[in-house]
Structures are given as C-alpha cells and as structure tokens.
C-alpha cells in the first residue's frame, strides 16, 4: 500500500483511501448494502456504495447497463445542465470487469446573493459486480473541474485497491 493511503475494511471487503481524508460511515449501512464517504480537506468527496448483486442483476443485464442507468439518473436531476460523457472504459477489479465513466456537467446552484448559477463539475464512477461476495460496488465522486487530475487519480488508486471478496 502507498504511504499516502490507509485501509478501510468492513463486512469482508476493503479499500485503500487517501490518508488526508476524513471517513464518514453511514450509520444505516449493513452488510448487505450501505455507503461510506471519504471527505477531502478541500471539501471534495469520494463515495463507496455497495448492495445486493442479485437485485442489481435483475434490473441490469450487464455492468455497463448498471453504470449507464446511474449516469441517466444524474442527467435527469433538476440541477444538472450540459451533461457530456468525457470517457468510458472497462477496468479490471480483482478479476471482475468494471465499468468506468467520466462525465462533465454544469451543476445549477442557488445562492442567496448570487441567484442561480452554473458551476462546472466533473464526475467519475466505477461500477463493479462481484459474484464471489454477492455484492455490487460503486465508487463515485462529483468535484470541481479544476481538481479533475487529483480526484481521478485517487478514484483509480482506490479502485485498484478494492478487495471485494
């Protein structure tokens, strides 16, 4: 493990996360499904969610379909404009095929003094289906465009470190 990372482990899976992060575990999380947030000092966040693989595979024939559904959900939220897919790829996570996506969008924010304005953001996600643990995992983040390189690097390092079974 890189000295810039520490290990988070729970319910039989683990992931390395940047040491600078504060970890927030959702108290409603269970072995079957849940999420954890890794908070960066500059207020960016990377999320790790997991759930029942059987439920996911009933809804989605492929990992790509699961990932595409997540992108469509983001696209349809009322505060998103100018949604553009920057890249998509297949990556390997512990012998499992995983779907990686990077999108660019404008998030509409409302400020008391500034009114509604469009803030450029990037989002990255990795979807993994693990039959060995009967779970799916999603690593994702939404962050300011100027921090793309740092956040994408962190997400890919976390993805490579995920021990899903």
Language-model region placement:
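Short, solvent-exposed coil/turn segments at beta-strand boundaries
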Residues: 16-19, 41-43, 94-96, 128-136
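Solvent-exposed loop/turn segments at secondary-structure junctions
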Residues: 55, 107-108, 145-147
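Surface-exposed amphipathic alpha-helical segments
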Residues: 21, 133-165
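Short, mixed charged/polar active-site loops
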Residues: 45, 118-122, 134-136
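N-terminal low-complexity, Pro/Thr/Ser-rich intrinsically disordered segments
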Residues: 1-6
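Short aromatic-centered micro-motifs
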Residues: 8, 38, 91
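Secretory pathway targeting signatures of secreted, lumenal, and periplasmic proteins
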Residues: 11-74
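Signature of long, low-cysteine stretches enriched in small and polar/charged residues
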Residues: 68-130
């Amino acid at each position: 493990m890189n000295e810039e990372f520490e290990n988070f482990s729970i319910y039989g899976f683990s992931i390395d996360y940047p040491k600078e992060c504060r970890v927030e575990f959702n108290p409603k999380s269970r072995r079957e499904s849940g999420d954890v947030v890794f908070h960066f000092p500059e207020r960016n966040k990377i999320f790790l969610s997991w759930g029942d693989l059987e439920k996911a595979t009933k809804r989605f024939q492929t990992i790509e379909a699961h990932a595409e559904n997540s992108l469509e959900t983001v696209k349809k939220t009322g505060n998103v404009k100018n949604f553009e897919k920057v890249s998509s790829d297949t990556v390997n996570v512990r012998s499992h095929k995983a779907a990686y996506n990077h999108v660019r969008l404008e998030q509409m924010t409302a400020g008391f003094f500034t009114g509604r304005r469009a803030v450029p953001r990037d989002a990255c996600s990795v979807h993994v289906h693990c039959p060995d643990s009967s779970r799916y995992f999603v690593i994702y983040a939404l962050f300011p465009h100027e921090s793309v390189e740092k956040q994408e690097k962190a997400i890919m390092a976390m993805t490579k470190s995920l021990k899903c079974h």
